[in-house]
Amino acid sequence: MPKLNALVVGSTGYIGVQLIKLLVKHKYINIKYLCGNSSVGKKISNYDKYFLNKKLPKIIKFNKNLLKNIDVVFTALPNGEAQDISKHLNKNTTLIDLAADFRLEKSSDYLKWYKQKHRAKNLIKKSLYSLPEINGKDINNYQIISCPGCYPTSILLPLIPLFKNNLIKVKNIVMDSKSGYSGAGRGVHIKFKDKNLYESLSAYGVGYHRHNSEIEQMLKKFTKKNLDFNFTPHLTPMFRGILSTIYVDLEKDVTQSKIIKTLYNFYKKNHFIKILKADSLISTNDVINTNNCFISVCKSKYKNKIIILSAIDNLIKGGAGQAVQNLNIKFNFPIKSGLLWDMF
């Protein structure tokens, strides 16, 4: 099978670097171009010593002419920038976006949550918000693939099967997520320069974090009822990983064992989702440097409630790994291609 030519735009951010680490191990991918802005002319090894002995192109500035011989473009850019690139795609070029440009199905929602007008409205309907385990099977019908955010990934994977089977109530859901500071990007060091980033736990986006929008959009596909949930993210003094704790009310006569069995049956043929035994305690250490999601269902002191724990690596399953997983589905590559763990 010939290799696909890939272009990565936004090569030097935490997600971009992680993506390149995965792609250099992907036997069906040739990294033809790496693009950046302030990093033009530099080597990617300047940003991670892992690349010191890797043969990779120097970072250049993106221009639309680079797309001529490219099969797949990965965009790991600030929100809004992939929209401009999407307008110049060739007929046979796939765009996989790791930001939020094509996550929301309505341009009005994008304006509401991201405070900017969508500059490629006509392409929204040609894009797919692809959470691989849920709707990845539809990916072949789309040229633009939007990867879910890191927090929504950790929340939607345990909740969607339960919504789909009407096992939990759609009201009074509490989603409490804690992430390593890499989730805030390299700029987090500037933002916290006068504070001790490594000794502080802080909530942010309380009540209105942008990821509320895609969580609600996706969950609504699996219920006709009105949703009622609160989602609060936190930055923690660790580099990578997300642990989400989700509190839900059970429907009548639904038990903890029923919840676990449903999740197990839903994901039993999946390579990356692991449903643990009842009341298992999990940590981010269980999943960092992998494309896995660990899910545990725990009892509450109230019989009509359960507590769900969900752990992922925000840079892999919540970012670059999910992009590669979508790539593999789109081009019918073995699902684990580029997602092996001997590289870190």
Region locations from a protein language model:
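Short acidic/glycine-rich loop or secondary-structure boundary segments that cap or lie
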Residues: 154-155, 182-186, 238-242, 254-256
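Alpha-helical scaffold segments in soluble metabolic enzymes
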Residues: 18, 22, 157-161, 214-218, ...
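Short, glycine- and charge-enriched coil/turn segments that flank and shape catalytic ligand pockets
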Residues: 91, 138, 166, 221-227, ...
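N-terminal Rossmann-like NAD(P) cofactor-binding subdomain of oxidoreductases
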Residues: 1-199, 204-206, 298-302, 337, ...
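C-terminal active-site/capping subdomain that shapes the small-molecule cofactor and substrate pocket
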Residues: 244-344
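Short Gly/Pro-enriched turn/cap motifs at secondary-structure boundaries
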Residues: 203-207, 235, 283-287
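Generic secondary-structure signature for well-ordered alpha-helical cores
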Residues: 25-28, 164-168, 209, 220-224, ...
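Oxyanion-binding "anion nests"
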Residues: 208-231, 235, 239, 243-245
